[in-house]
Regions:
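Catalytic cores of secreted/periplasmic lytic hydrolases that degrade extracellular macromolecules
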Residues: 1-145
């Protein structure tokens, strides 16, 4: 494991564990997906805005997200959620999976089935250049690390 990888796991496993307990998901699945979405916690979105999962700003405010947004300055101009702290990002992610992606959530304790279901769900947007099969493979490989 690289130093960056070890640091990400050390820093974020406690958040994933709490979110996993609260929303009945394997914390390592949460951690794997967060590592992919945030480039091991090095992305601008995770470092500056505590958004470790690339969650866009659609939907309603909730107990983990107060409605603050950041608009990316790239060709997609997507708006992303801004979180007060990393724990809120992990909670909001697990809440989102449990409420909007029920098929993936139902497999939240089986990482291979979860990866398949989330990769082939509306969570992934191929219009933004995402590859469903690449995403599925990445989640599985990161989990197994």
């Amino acid at each position: 494991m690289s130093i960056k990888t070890e640091q990400y796991v050390t820093d974020n496993y406690p958040y994933a564990k709490k979110a996993g307990e609260k929303f009945a998901m394997d914390p390592l699945v949460i951690l794997a997906q967060g590592s992919f979405e945030s480039a091991w916690g090095t992305s601008n979105l995770s470092k500056k805005y505590n958004n470790f999962f690339g969650i866009t700003a659609g939907g309603s405010k909730n107990e983990y997200w107060d409605g603050e947004i950041y608009q990316a300055q790239n060709k997609y101009k997507l708006k992303f959620r801004v979180y007060k702290n990393p724990q809120d990002s992990f909670y909001d992610f697990a809440r989102l999976i449990s409420s909007k992606y029920k098929s993936a959530h139902a497999a939240g304790q089986d990482y291979k089935t979860y990866a398949q279901r989330i990769a082939y769900s509306p969570y992934i947007s191929e219009s933004n250049g995402d590859s469903r099969e690449g995403y599925r493979s990445a989640i599985i490989n990161l989990y197994e690390r």
